[in-house]
From Swiss-Prot:
It comes from Acidovorax sp. (strain JS42). The gene is cobQ. The active site is at C342, H447. This is Cobyric acid synthase. The keyword tRNA-binding does not apply. PANTHER family: COBYRIC ACID SYNTHASE, DETHIOBIOTIN SYNTHETASE. Keywords: Cobalamin biosynthesis, Glutamine amidotransferase. Residues 261-455 form the GATase cobBQ-type domain. Gene3D superfamilies: 3.40.50.880, P-loop containing nucleotide triphosphate hydrolases. Catalyzes amidations at positions B, D, E, and G on adenosylcobyrinic A,C-diamide. NH(2) groups are provided by glutamine, and one molecule of ATP is hydrogenolyzed for each amidation. NCBIfam families: cobQ, PRK00784.1.
Amino acid sequence: MNKTRPGPARCVMVLGTTSGAGKSWLATALCRYYSNQGLKVAPFKAQNMSNNARVVAAPGEQFGEIGSAQYFQALAARAVPDVRMNPLLLKPEADTKSQVVLLGQVSDELSQLPWRGRSQRVWPQIAAALDALRAENDVVVIEGAGSPAEINLHASDVVNMRVARHAEARCLLVTDIDRGGAFAHLFGTWALLPEEERALIAGFVLNKFRGDEALLAPAPQMLQDKTGVPVVATIPMQWNHGLPEEDGVFDMRSTAVGAVHTRIAVVAYPRISNLDEFQPLKNVPGVRLSWARSPADVEGADWIVLPGSKATAADLAWLRAQGLDAAIAAHAARGGRVLGVCGGLQMLGEALIDTVGVDGNGPGLGLLPLVTSFEATKTVRPTRQCFGAVQGAWRHLAGVAVQGYEIHHGQTAQHPAMAASGDVARELMPGLAWQNPAGNVLGLYLHGLFEDAAVLRALFGADAPTLDAVFEGLAAGIARHFEPRALDALAAQ
């Protein structure tokens, strides 16, 4: 779509009173709503802290990483995702350590800097990325992070009100009313902002409301009388809006549609990554998805899934400390299905070898006769591959082509000593996927398996709702629940 308006794009920004207030899904809904109005739209989030990342286009015919939320927002906007949409991505590796990704590429230098020093270094690149998107689009939908009123962080802010001021954005402040204290959250956040920043708040949004909306009166009008800012939307609770959660382990309520025939337990280790790729399983009829943190959590499971990890050796040690290693081994010995993705694949092998200080050494779970060597260079690329002659429990994947992506430091191969004795894993994709001789343990580097419709049909004989249908539903929902003309006024020139 071509730009339809002269001059830089109007910016609409979604701020929240807290983390988890609903910024990401609302920004996604706005992207599709404005795109449906015939406008050229792009998403933007200056800084994201998440181990959920996607591979997108980067300058110089390269590929880079951005947060998953901005990737999905770009799709909602009918835009091609690129690294400018999330110029700074922080990927936590420990409680006090993050890998810094600037414009899609890992920066070892920035990763070593303290947060306050780093923020001043990266602001010029953040501002340039936003300015470039504004020059190319009619509307840029900006997502903030956490709360804009964290007064201890205000001087080093690069993601909330500094962005709002730079973009002269019209801001929505959203709160989770289901938590309680919504009006205090809204007023307190507004009151803590400097006067010039309060002026950028165009409307308050009450999210996750349950009950009779009439019972809110007279609070919305009282809040407007105190602040001059109207409540422009009251949005009902959505237990499953269909989008992956941006951070943490997503809500598992209502994960089975119809009678349960497949129980899938996903191991939730501390540094789990790319967990959003399992979101489509929540919508597959008959599938019950659950998180596993103890042996009791995998009892009765048909599948056990080891997802990606930002700290494979440390998460494997955690898994052993919980006793999950024995539970997984017993499940596999009974013929139960085990799936490892990226870091999970590495854990399933015989050994982890780290000579460059990326992750750590240690023995694997020994369910695949493979060995992984960690490298300083990170593999980041989209990948389309076809499964080879898959056998056993995963045989329905044979011949299925998958469009996915790779994000990993490790390189995995057959264990030389075991191969010499005839214990060889069946390679299903060159350098990407392997299966044990019994056929029930599968490991692969390729992320995005369950986001592929062909895979869902092969494994479950069913389709999940398409992302496009999810985006349309979100856009229709905000059109119903915002005050008339409020959305159009936000994006007006």
